[in-house]
Amino acid sequence: MVHSQLPVAGPLRLLCALLLLPSATMIPGGLSPRSVTDPDVQEAAEFAVQEYNALSANAYYYKQLRIVEAQSQVVSGAKYYLTMELMKTKCAKTTGKPKVYKEIQNCELPPKAQQEKLTCHFQVWSRPWLGKIELTKMSCN
């Protein structure tokens, strides 16, 4: 009986070794947690806020309060998965040139009783060698 279990020992050792690897080990093509302060994460977040304001039908701009969570994935470039909090500002969207991110971030917030906060999930795909960055998914509530 002991003799029949020997072929299982090799794969069992491999499985045990894999289970002992740190959970943060990077898997090619897999999602990796990222620091919300990383410059490329900040750039993706700025782009997401800019696009949210361009695409939304809201009469006022929303600014970034904070990045709650960031992950990235290597997929012919980098795809960023961001969870962010946005807050409605007192800056109205007017006809003409839209505000850029830094201008939006300088907009004042309404009084506490009138504040509207959103939690948004964004996917941003960056391909810097092509000079392209796209918002591929957006949902806010």
From Swiss-Prot:
Of the GO CC terms on this record, one is: extracellular exosome
Q: Note the PROSITE patterns from the entry.
A: CYSTATIN (PS00287)
* Localization: Secreted
The site feature described as Reactive site is recorded at: 29
**In which broad location class does this protein mainly occur, judging by the first location in its UniProt entry?**
secreted
Q: Molecular function terms in GO for this entry?
A: cysteine-type endopeptidase inhibitor activity
Enumerate the Pfam families for this protein: Cystatin
Q: Where does the Cystatin domain lie?
A: 29-129
State the disulfide connectivity: 91-107, 120-140
Residues forming the motif Secondary area of contact are 73-77
**What are the boundaries of the signal sequence?**
1-26
SUPFAM superfamilies associated with the record: Cystatin/monellin
| Gene3D superfamilies listed in its UniProt record | 3.10.450.10
SMART domains, per database record: CY
Keywords attached to this entry: Disulfide bond, Protease inhibitor, Secreted, Signal, Thiol protease inhibitor
Q: In which tissues is it expressed?
A: Expressed at a low level by the venom gland (at protein level).
> Family per UniProt?
Belongs to the cystatin family.
Q: What else is known?
A: Negative results: the recombinant protein does not inhibit calpain-1 (CAPN1), a C2 family cysteine protease and legumain (LGMN), a C13 family cysteine protease. Does not provoke cell death (PC3 prostrate cancer cells).
Cited function: Inhibits various C1 cysteine proteases including cathepsin L, papain and cathepsin B. This protein has no toxic activity and its function in the venom is unknown. It may play a role as a housekeeping or regulatory protein.
Name of this chain's protein: Cystatin
Q: Which organism is it from?
A: Pseudechis australis
